């Protein structure tokens, strides 16, 4: 209540509280209020000042509520604004309960799943302007629907009610086509309702169906876990579809390391190129096999990785889509042997110095012996890797008192056999002038060479 530019006297207001508003308390800034008659005796109000009356009320019914008030005062020259009205709507209390069930726990692509949604108003009041949202997984396509109350919008997936009476229950049925694998669900929730809900914990529910797709099971192996440089190995990749659906456009990514040189590819279906094995469709319980024959070109520890995928359909068990095979490659070792045969007519003395370089590891050996005519001596120098070089420095002496012809034959046996013959005439006797021969031997996978 406000006086504008003039003082007013003996102001009296009447406030009419309708049924549904039960006064619990009230207070005013001036005057006296009679609760029985609804009359507020205010008294005088100076210009530009306000006086107020406040009610604290209990709402005990739903619907539209209107409060009317009017005021009279001496000195009030404008009665046009002496009346006021306040209207508001009182909503009730409801307890909407949602339940969702499906007729299948598991399904396959192409199956129809029936989802049943039940909405119950547990009261105590009617619920108005209800919207129930259905959040369907992308793999569930609504084909048919029916309901016994309200209205279902198949575009927005909303189930709409003007009113659901206290104690009333409604049912919505959705028949959905399954067109995707995975865990598919319908999440249902109360999106809108005019009334306050005393229990929001039962406003949401969901039902799920597990749709299995393919299950590609990949196994990768090598014929030799330990191999030598130059060996030939088989890389075998097996893919099985454990189902239940057909794996469409199945493929395997199998990139071979650089130390494996492909010699031959054998497969029972599809093509293998640039590290990709395109299998195509692989039906339930079918198996595809790939066998790659490759030569090991260098030493080291190498890992092969393979991954199977079916891009057109989900794999319900991706754990077994990958596999790994490891191969440890060493440089092979060969025995280095030398046979020295005396083809001279006299006994000779051989003094042999050997220096072996096995990839930086140096081995030195010295041999000093006499060899009668026509006899041989076998020397075993040890085991060495391919790529080893051996330097032979050989001194051969004439043990006779007179000059003689020194003739001997060296046979080197490693990755291949090489024979070296030496024939020197007029060699002074009694170890005065030995025959000196220096040679370098190379052990290679293609054979032994002498320089």
Swiss-Prot record:
Keywords: Plasmid. Gene3D superfamilies: Immunoglobulins. Disulfide bonds: none annotated. It comes from the Archaea. Transmembrane segments: none annotated. Pfam families: DUF11. The keyword Glycosyltransferase does not apply. PANTHER family: CONSERVED REPEAT DOMAIN PROTEIN (PTHR34819:SF5), LARGE CYSTEINE-RICH PERIPLASMIC PROTEIN OMCB (PTHR34819). To ORF5 in pFZ1. This is Uncharacterized protein ORF5B. It comes from Methanothermobacter thermautotrophicus (Methanobacterium thermoformicicum). The lineage of its organism: Archaea, Methanobacteriati, Methanobacteriota, Methanomada group, Methanobacteria.
């Amino acid at each position: 209540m406000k006086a504008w530019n003039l003082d007013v006297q003996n102001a009296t207001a009447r406030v009419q509280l309708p049924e549904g508003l039960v006064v619990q308390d009230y207070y005013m800034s001036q005057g006296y209020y009679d609760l029985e008659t609804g009359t507020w005796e205010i008294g005088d109000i100076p210009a530009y000042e306000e006086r107020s009356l406040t009610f604290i009320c209990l709402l005990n019914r739903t619907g539209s509520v209107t409060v009317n008030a009017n005021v009279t005062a001496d000195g009030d020259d404008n009665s046009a604004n002496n009346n006021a009205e306040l209207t508001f709507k009182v909503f009730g209390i409801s307890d909407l309960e949602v339940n969702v069930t499906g007729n299948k726990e598991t399904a396959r692509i192409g199956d129809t799943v029936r989802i049943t949604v039940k909405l119950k108003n547990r009261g105590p009041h009617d619920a108005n302007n209800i919207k129930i949202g259905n959040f369907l997984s992308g793999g569930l396509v609504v084909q048919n629907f029916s309901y016994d109350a309200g209205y279902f919008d198949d575009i927005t997936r909303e189930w709409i009610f003007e009113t659901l009476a206290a104690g009333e229950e409604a049912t919505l049925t959705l028949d959905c086509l399954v067109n995707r694998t995975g865990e598919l669900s319908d999440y249902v929730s109360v999106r809108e309702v005019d009334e306050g809900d005393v229990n929001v914990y039962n406003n949401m529910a969901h039902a799920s169906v597990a749709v299995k797709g393919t299950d590609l099971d990949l196994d990768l192996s090598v014929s030799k876990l330990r191999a030598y440089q130059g060996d030939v190995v088989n890389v075998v990749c097996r893919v099985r579809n454990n189902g239940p659906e057909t794996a469409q456009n199945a493929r395997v990514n199998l990139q071979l390391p650089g130390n494996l040189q492909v010699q031959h590819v054998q497969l029972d279906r599809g093509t293998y190129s640039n590290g990709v094995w395109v299998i195509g469709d692989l039906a339930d319980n079918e198996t595809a096999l790939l066998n790659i024959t490759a030569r090991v070109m260098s030493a080291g520890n190498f890992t092969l990785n393979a991954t199977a995928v079916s891009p057109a359909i989900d794999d319900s068990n991706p754990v077994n889509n990958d596999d790994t095979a490891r191969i440890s490659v060493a440089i092979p070792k060969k025995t280095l042997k030398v046979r020295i045969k005396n083809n001279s007519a006299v006994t000779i003395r051989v003094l042999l110095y050997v220096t072996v370089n096995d990839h930086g590891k140096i081995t030195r050996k010295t041999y000093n012996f006499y060899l009668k005519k026509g006899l041989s001596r076998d020397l075993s120098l040890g085991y060495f890797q391919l790529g080893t070089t051996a330097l032979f420095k050989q001194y051969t002496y004439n043990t006779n008192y007179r000059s003689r012809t020194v003739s001997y034959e060296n046979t080197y046996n490693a990755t291949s056999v090489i024979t070296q013959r030496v024939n020197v005439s007029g060699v002074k006797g009694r170890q005065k002038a030995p025959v000196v021969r220096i040679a370098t031997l190379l052990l290679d996978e293609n054979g032994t060479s002498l320089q």
